[in-house]
A protein has these predicted regions:
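Anionic-ligand binding patches
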Residues: 28-36, 42-61, 66-176
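Charged DNA-binding/catalytic regions of mobile-element recombinases
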Residues: 4
């Protein structure tokens, strides 16, 4: 398992719905506030908007916020990559920025593809081909040797530059 950077915690995700109306629990003056999500991925934008819908704040993509950056994700951990993205956008906007980095880490092959999940075997390689390659590399692995996890780090940079990071992992086994 990848070491967890200082300030990042592995935890189980609480999927319980609030027992009260949460619209109004957050920030009194939402009219001028917004959140920028450091991604160009339309699927991720749909997901994050659904997750944050109770805040009553607009959640903008980089493009919608007028941010044009080619961010190099050269961190060695999911936390480092998420922070690199969030800080790059925050430096341009000064507002609240969220970024994530996620991927699959397979123990038998040394934690690969890990932080390189999106670029594993090339960015234009389909997930079907990437998955087939991983399964082939696990041909001699049995039982718990096939252990893996999907890791997601979410990083927030607040208006004042404070950084908050959370990371969770979903443990499992790669099927044959």
């Amino acid at each position: 398992m990848q070491p967890v950077p200082e300030g990042v915690y592995r935890h189980k995700i609480n999927r319980e719905k609030p027992t009260h109306d949460t619209k109004g629990d957050h920030m009194e003056n939402n009219k001028e506030k917004r959140i920028i999500f450091a991604t160009g991925n339309a699927g991720k934008m749909r997901e994050i908007r659904a997750i944050l819908s109770d805040l009553g704040l607009p959640v903008l993509s980089m493009k919608e916020a007028g941010v044009v950056l080619d961010i190099v994700e050269d961190g060695k951990t999911f936390a480092e990559n998420a922070k690199i993205k969030a800080m790059a956008v925050w430096k341009q906007t000064g507002g609240v920025v969220l970024a994530d980095d996620s991927g699959l880490a397979v123990d038998y092959i040394g934690g690969e593809p890990g932080v390189y999940s999106a670029r594993y075997m090339g960015e234009d390689t389909s997930y079907e081909i990437k998955n087939r390659n991983i399964i082939e590399r696990l041909a001699n692995a049995e039982g718990k040797e096939r252990s893996a996890r999907f890791v997601c780090n979410i990083t927030a940079v607040l208006e004042d530059g404070r950084v908050i990071q959370r990371e969770a992992a979903m443990e499992g086994l790669i099927a044959k």
